[in-house]
Swiss-Prot record:
Source organism, top-level taxon: Bacteria
Binding-site residues for Zn(2+) 1, renumbered to this chain: H60, H62, H120, D137
Pfam families: HAGH_C (PF16123), Lactamase_B (PF00753)
UniProt cofactor(s): Zn(2+)
InterPro entries: Clx_II_MBL (IPR035680), Glyoxalase_II_hydrolase (IPR050110), HAGH_C (IPR032282), Hydroxyacylglutathione_Hdrlase (IPR017782), Metallo-B-lactamas (IPR001279), RibonucZ/Hydroxyglut_hydro (IPR036866)
Molecular function per GO: hydroxyacylglutathione hydrolase activity; metal ion binding
Pathways per UniProt: Secondary metabolite metabolism; methylglyoxal degradation; (R)-lactate from methylglyoxal: step 2/2
BP GO terms, sorted: methylglyoxal catabolic process to D-lactate via S-lactoyl-glutathione
Cofactor comment text: Binds 2 Zn(2+) ions per subunit.
Keywords linked to the UniProt accession: Hydrolase, Metal-binding, Zinc
Protein name: Hydroxyacylglutathione hydrolase
Family affiliation: Belongs to the metallo-beta-lactamase superfamily. Glyoxalase II family.
């Protein structure tokens, strides 16, 4: 079993901390962190909890996901394993990942499945550990990342691949964008009962300054327009907004992303 904790950073980032938790309930003596954009946030957590840093996982090269790597290496030593996509030439990555497959986090007793997700950036990857997905800026709750380097088709395929994961897969996104994403989702699919219910729950959480994450793949398939581009209501909304017929899910997805970029 995996124990996960989101650490808030900057305005809306989450640095995810995880460690194995044995059947007895005793946790491992150290943690991994995902996308430490701010090293001090991680250091403060380690001091507070008395944990050791076992390693770092990086999903893509953007500075708000990588900015803390060098500080953490200076503090805890160059032996710290830092995994990340080889193609993105990220300073501090000493275990470059070149393809889909498994990596063994032996010091934590865990295996991670690497999933290539081009779109937000060309080299973007996600890590699936047990039933927990660390997906960076590809999939958000009720939304998806902007397409900075890849194509709409690449992003569509990446999200489609994530949509094939089991419904109970926990989704650990890197940003607390949920409320803003839900405003758009309700605009394009206003009669989605699951979306209406989820919006109320998310608003209640944020009113208490609590994270809306992790979500789940099943939840996102029910409420996220970017995983629902074949929805009849979404296609009708797009047809009205763009004054054109919607012929296929990729076209629908591309127009959704275009609309959201200017929403």
């Amino acid at each position: 079993m995996l124990h996960i904790t989101p650490l808030a950073a900057f305005n809306d980032n989450y640095i995810w901390v995880f460690q194995s938790q044995q059947n007895t309930g005793a946790e491992s003596s150290g943690i991994y962190v995902v996308d430490p954009g701010d090293g001090q946030v991680v250091i403060d957590y380690l001091i507070q909890t008395g944990q050791a840093l076992l390693g770092i996982l990086i999903t893509h090269h953007h500075h708000d996901h990588t900015g803390g790597i060098e500080q953490l290496i200076r503090r805890f030593g160059a032996q710290i394993a830092v995994y990340g996509p080889q193609s993105e030439n990220i300073i501090g990555v000493n275990h470059p990942i070149v393809a889909n497959g498994d990596i063994s986090l032996t010091n934590a007793g865990l295996n991670a499945k690497v999933i290539q997700l081009p779109g937000h950036t060309l080299g973007h990857i996600a890590y699936l550990i047990e039933d927990v997905l660390f997906c960076g800026d590809t999939l958000f709750s009720a939304g998806c990342g902007r397409i900075f380097e890849g194509s709409a088709e690449q992003m569509y395929q990446s999200l489609s691949e994530l949509g094939q994961l089991p419904d109970n897969t926990k989704v650990c996104c890197a940003h607390e964008y949920t409320i803003a994403n839900l405003a758009f989702a309700n605009r394009v699919e206003p009669n989605n009962a699951a979306l209406i219910d989820y919006t109320k729950k998310a608003q209640a959480l944020r009113a208490q300054n609590l994270p809306t994450l992790p979500s789940s793949i099943g939840q996102e398939k029910a409420i996220n327009p970017f995983l629902r581009s074949d929805s009849e209501e979404i296609c009708q909304s797009l047809s009205i907004q763009f004054q054109q017929p919607i012929n296929n899910p990729l076209q629908s997805f591309s127009l959704l992303r275009q609309w959201k970029d200017n929403f």
